[in-house]
Amino acid sequence: MIPQIICVEGPTATGKRKMGVALAHRFGGEVVSVDSMQIYRGMAIGTAAPTPEEMEGIPHHMVGVADPAESWSVARFVSEADVCVQDILRRGRRPILVGGTGLYLESLIRGTDFAAGSAGGVTRQRLQQRLEQEGIGPLLAELQTIDPDSAARLHPSDEKRILRALEVWYETGETITQHDRRTRQQPPRYQAAYIGLSFQDRAQLRRRIDLRVDEMVRQGLLEEVQALLAAGLPPTATAWQAIGYKQFLAAADGRCTVTEAIEEVKLRSRQYAKRQLTWLRRNPDIHWILWGEEPNFPQGLQNATEYLTALGLR
């Protein structure tokens, strides 16, 4: 079956956005951003959201659609992004999914049936109260009893997902491991072709990440953080957890220097890129384009185009 959707994936700073726009021109597509933080308004610099010039006239969806004070879940993202995908297909265009948030992209392609529960639900509120009163230790211990597989996968500091796993159990009687296993057995909602971007040498990827962070600082990342503070964005907002914002919030509060914040952002970004690659390697269907010392976009675009054309895309 000819793929309905093109996915452009890869770790941060590998040129996904540029490739996605080029493929949209080539295959009559529109870009759907699959980035858990580009959904927020007023955070264009730190999330590397595309500028109007970088969009090159290609419609972009799921960029700057939410207030930073809102808390978004993967379930909500998939629900709203799916509306975009369906609309693009209905108009005879091709959705080009671009981003590095692997869970969001995989869930959208699979049409994941999310378990019950929401961030504002009664069960979540009770668990949140327990977290504040008891700390994460007892909650993680409870999860280890209920769903040892899930507990083993989660980092002890990943409070959000620990609470989610417990919430699923309390509301459905099914562990999140059982739910995910059942979901994976279902046929995917969409047929997709995957293009993966990275570097042959991991050191080059790290260098590109450092250069990107330096460029964000020059563009005004600190000023963007200060603007969010001035707008009254509460320190508990999920948006502050984005790499770059969390560290520069600390600098704005005087808890560290700007120089220390920059180095921390670079470190966290490199660690995130490593996790992204680990996730992507789970998918054997990705057609990888590995850059040399610098990205060769004309050559990479030709490579991607030939691969997609061979799959039947026109």
Put a short name on every predicted segment.
Residues 1-314:
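Phosphate/pyrophosphate-binding catalytic cores of soluble transferases and nucleic-acid-acting enzymes
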